[in-house]
Design a protein with these regions (language model features):
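Rossmann-like NAD(P) dinucleotide-binding subdomain of oxidoreductase/dehydrogenase enzymes
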Residues: 1-127, 144, 299, 303
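Short beta-alpha junction loops
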Residues: 40-42, 148-149, 288-290
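Short, charged/polar "capping" segments at the starts of alpha-helices
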Residues: 44, 92-93, 151-152, 267-272, ...
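Alpha-helical scaffold elements adjacent to nucleotide-binding pockets in ATP/GTP-utilizing enzyme cores
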Residues: 48-52, 152-159
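Short, conserved active-site loop motifs that form the nucleotide-linked donor/cofactor pocket
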Residues: 63, 239-240
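Short helix-loop capping/hinge motifs at secondary-structure junctions, enriched
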Residues: 92, 118-121, 149-153, 226-230
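C-terminal segments
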Residues: 108, 115-141, 158-225, 246, ...
Length: 344
């Protein structure tokens, strides 16, 4: 049978995208009691969900929202039977070795253009980079090009530059907003990691908003080799590294990827990509990296972590209930009882 591994499931929720909260709802369906520690940046989505679940009949002993600081958050993880935590490399290093914690770390999603017609797929690259505000782990942060990598970088930068800066409350806002200090810190961090990479986008990424805060304009950088360390940099705004790639580079630069969009006619390469353990999802053809749908696992099914197979062996016939005095077993019941006890 399919059995739970525990009773209480703790979630240290992220604040990058509302859709991440769809995952822990599955734990409720499996019979877990769920405790959610929301992100301080975006506590609204889990609050709405928990409120709706309360109205639907779930009790406070079944699902609870626990806003806490980071110190108490770790206590929550330790007290639960199982936990799911989101974060960057530091979180992955802290919890990654524990079997009772599911770490949702950096996605480092990628696009491979290797069909000889890279110019036809610019829209797919732009969607993969900028879709959902580029805040999701399934947004592409690196593009590998078998061909004209500089040309692809320029076209992607041109298309992304057409995104209009809007305050976050606007209906047509696309770019994520930050405190001005945070936006400038992200820009400075990016500049400090360029090394030999060429910044294709404009030099000033920070766009301060009249009402306060700022958004970061998209950043496109061109690298000179597929194994450059910058391809692993993932930032919470449209930021993508474009690198040359050839069949001689193989699968190695494409590893450690949540979602890889692979546009190539090479079936042998596709087979190797699908079989590569460090690549969680492979989209073949013009399908953006953030493409998801009902029944399609994002990073495996949550049930694979929360549940396990359990063997239960029992007699084919249960022990019968006591009968009123004088009432006799039917012939069939008598035969089955004899069979169970080895008398038939």
């Amino acid at each position: 049978m399919w059995a739970r591994k525990g009773e209480v499931f703790a979630v240290l929720a992220p604040g990058n995208h509302p859709a991440t909260h769809a995952a822990w709802l599955e734990a409720l369906a499996m019979g877990y009691r769920v405790a959610i520690r929301p992100s301080r940046r975006e506590p609204f989505t889990p609050h709405r969900l928990v409120s709706a679940l309360r109205q639907a009949g779930f009790g406070s002993d079944q699902v609870v929202l626990l806003p806490t600081d980071h110190t108490v958050a770790d206590v929550l993880v330790q007290a639960a039977d199982l936990a799911m935590v989101y974060g960057g490399d530091e979180v992955a290093a802290t919890y990654g070795a524990r079997a009772d914690i599911l770490v949702q770390g950096p996605g480092r999603s990628k696009v491979l253009l290797a069909d000889g017609h890279s110019e036809r797929h610019i829209a797919t690259v732009v969607d993969s980079v900028g879709g959902h505000g580029a805040t999701a782990c399934v947004n592409a942060t690196a593009v590998f090009v078998d061909g004209d990598a500089p040309g692809v970088a320029r076209e992607v930068a041109r298309s992304l530059s057409e995104i209009v800066v809007r305050p976050p409350e606007s209906d047509d806002a696309v770019l994520p907003a930050f405190r001005v200090e945070r936006a400038k810190a992200l820009q400075n961090y990016l500049r400090g990691r360029l090394d030999t990479a060429e910044m294709i986008s404009g030099p000033d990424l920070v766009a301060e908003l009249p009402g306060g805060g700022a958004v970061l304009r998209p950043a496109v950088m061109l690298l000179d080799r597929a194994d450059a360390p910058q391809v692993n940099i993932e930032l919470p705004f449209p930021c993508v590294w474009v690198a040359p790639w050839s069949p001689a580079d193989g699968v190695a630069p494409l590893r450690n990827t949540l979602t890889l969009t692979a546009i190539t006619p090479d079936e042998d390469l596709l087979t190797r990509l699908v079989e590569e353990p460090s690549i969680s999802n492979v989209h073949v053809g013009d399908r953006p990296t953030f493409l998801m749908g009902p029944g399609l696992p994002h990073d495996g099914h949550l049930a694979e972590f929360l549940m396990r197979s359990k063997t239960v062996i029992r007699d084919r016939s249960p022990v019968p209930l006591p009968r009123p005095e004088g009432e006799r077993l039917t012939g069939k019941e008598s035969f089955r009882m004899r069979e169970v006890h080895g008398l038939g």
